[in-house]
């Protein structure tokens, strides 16, 4: 038995900040912003965090799956911005969503790829008949040091997937592979508030090498070629990197543009590529095939082949789309953004 996506859901905070405002405040050159291919980024409100956003996106996924949450046998939560350093978010979500306590809950960590690894694991549990349904969440209020280039892209969003049996799926997971190595491109040491980049490793040795290796491995193991896919979705640390991957693979931009989210909301880390996948599922038609390749620093990439079924059309209508959340926005100032994300420190 194959596994598939029975339900999917997204959530993006309403607040946005123009990345040019951040660049101007810190004296970053306009060319830096242009090179990133970004316009705005999503900012959490003062009462939003990776847990509350995960609840929102999971409720949308449950609407599309049209199942009782008590039927879910595992909840895996991928994030770089957990509310607690030591206390799982998955347990909070299990009780908040009404998932049975006779279930497995765990938080996944692999930079921006924790949720993607979770998708592979839950898919395997469904295929092995260990569970009927599993919930996978990628949710982040991404951290960045004020004035760092990373602050232009680090964003907030959440995406959730309910994985279940093939005969109930709006899209079937046909195949999946992973590619992993010890590449120090990005890290945050224990006790440090913000991550740092190993600049020489960020592009070619990390992002490009791992995504291209995972995609080529998927092709080799399954006999796929570019023309077999209608959509391609890659991890989106900025607006330019996924387009460069497409050019390296000689993929038409028409097959990439529908899955782009970072030019509009920035990079929400664990919700990046998987949010792009949700955006494609919102519009995909039966019989179309999607390749999605998330990436996580440190470093690793997964590549999935996903085949859309005729059940997709009914599910698309049952919850708000990614585009709905992208267009639902309120622009805020840097001072508001700094306040809601805790960049101001008050000492008494």
From Swiss-Prot:
(3S)-3-hydroxy-3-methylglutaryl-CoA binds at residues 29, 112, 153, 202, 235, 267, 297. One of its GO terms (biological process) is isopentenyl diphosphate biosynthetic process, mevalonate pathway. It comes from the Archaea. The active site is at residues 80, 112, 235. Keywords: Acyltransferase, Isoprene biosynthesis, Transferase. InterPro entries: ACP_syn_III_C (IPR013747), HMG_CoA_synth_N (IPR013528), HMG_CoA_Synthase (IPR004656), Thiolase-like (IPR016039). It holds the Pfam family HMG_CoA_synt_N. Catalyzes the condensation of acetyl-CoA with acetoacetyl-CoA to form 3-hydroxy-3-methylglutaryl-CoA (HMG-CoA). Functions in the mevalonate (MVA) pathway leading to isopentenyl diphosphate (IPP), a key precursor for the biosynthesis of isoprenoid compounds that are building blocks of archaeal membrane lipids. This is Hydroxymethylglutaryl-CoA synthase.
């Amino acid at each position: 038995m194959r596994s598939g996506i029975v339900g999917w859901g997204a959530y993006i905070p309403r607040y946005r900040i123009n990345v040019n405002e951040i660049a101007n405040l810190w004296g970053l050159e306009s060319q830096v912003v242009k090179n990133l291919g970004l316009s705005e980024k999503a900012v959490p409100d003062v009462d939003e965090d990776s847990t509350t956003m995960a609840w929102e996106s999971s409720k949308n996924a449950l609407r599309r799956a049209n199942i009782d949450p008590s039927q879910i046998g595992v909840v895996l939560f991928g994030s770089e911005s957990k509310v607690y350093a030591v206390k799982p978010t998955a347990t909070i979500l299990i009780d908040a969503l009404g998932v049975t306590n006779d279930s497995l809950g765990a938080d996944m960590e692999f930079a921006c790829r924790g949720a993607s690894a979770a998708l592979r694991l839950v898919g395997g549990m469904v295929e092995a008949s260990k569970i009927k349904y599993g919930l996978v969440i990628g949710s982040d209020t991404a951290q960045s040091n004020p004035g760092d280039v990373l602050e232009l892209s680090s964003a907030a969003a959440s995406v959730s997937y309910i994985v279940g049996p093939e005969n109930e799926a709006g899209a079937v997971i046909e195949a999946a592979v992973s590619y992993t190595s010890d590449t120090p491109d990005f890290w945050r040491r224990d006790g440090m508030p913000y991550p740092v980049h190993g600049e020489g490793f960020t592009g070619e040795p990390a992002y490009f090498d791992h995504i291209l290796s995972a995609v080529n491995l998927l092709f080799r193991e399954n006999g796929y070629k570019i023309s077999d896919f209608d959509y391609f979705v890659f991890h989106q640390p900025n607006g330019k990197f996924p387009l460069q991957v497409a050019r390296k693979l000689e993929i038409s931009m028409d097959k990439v543009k529908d899955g782009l989210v970072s030019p509009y909301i920035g990079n929400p880390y664990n919700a990046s590529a998987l949010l792009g996948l949700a955006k494609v599922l919102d519009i995909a038609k039966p019989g179309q095939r999607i390749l999605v390749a998330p990436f996580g620093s440190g470093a690793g990439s997964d590549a999935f082949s996903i085949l859309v079924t005729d059940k997709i059309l009914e599910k698309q209508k049952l919850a708000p789309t990614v585009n709905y959340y992208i267009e639902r926005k309120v622009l805020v100032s840097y001072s508001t953004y700094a306040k809601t994300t805790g960049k101001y420190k008050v000492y008494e």
